[in-house]
Design a protein with these regions (language model features):
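AAA+ P-loop ATPase motor domain of ring mechanoenzymes
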Residues: 1-143, 150-168
Length: 168
């Protein structure tokens, strides 16, 4: 290889940019995978829920009195809670949107999950507005119906992180 004749062109630079995944920002790929079949309206109640969620997102975007808002979607498995959250995250166009799913932590110890949760929230604080989707909280907490058993360490971390106000 003739090192003196190696040249990096703008095309090379642009190609490299396509390969880079930003540490911050809105990564819509994971959210898009959560709604492969799109969103289907399930009537008036569903539309009211979507409207309420969009209002909450807008409130966080424009209100100085609401630096943080926590919302829980509860329902049976397979009813579209994750898909709805993903659609709203994409639609929000917030500069920082992330999905935190137990799928990425198979076999990970509690300490790693807690550390990654804390880092996620710390990263979110660096953006003017952020949206974090905590998917499948029961699995994240390692909840088991029989017993019942769950990870108190992860629960305590979530309780602290979900209540802690962002720094000014």
């Amino acid at each position: 290889i003739d090192e003196e004749n190696i040249k990096v062109t703008m095309a090379d630079f642009e190609k490299a940019l396509l390969e880079v995944k930003p540490a911050f920002g809105a990564s819509t790929t994971l959210f898009e995978r959560c709604m492969l079949n799109g969103m289907i309206s399930h009537g008036e109640t569903h539309e009211k829920l979507v409207s309420t969620m969009e209002s909450l997102i807008e409130q966080v975007r424009v209100s100085e009195k609401t630096p943080m808002l926590t919302c829980l979607l509860e329902g049976s498995a397979g009813t579209g809670k994750t898909a709805l959250s993903a659609a709203l995250a994409i639609k929000s166009q917030f500069p920082f949107t992330k999905l935190f799913s137990p799928d990425t932590f198979v076999g990970a110890p509690e300490a790693k999950k807690c550390a990654d949760l804390a880092k996620l929230f710390d990263d979110a604080y660096k953006s003017p507005v952020s949206l974090i989707v905590l998917d499948d909280i029961e699995r994240l907490l390692e909840y088991v119906d029989v017993g019942p058993r769950f990870s108190n360490v992860i629960l305590q971390a979530l309780l602290v992180l979900l209540k802690r106000q962002p720094p000014p």
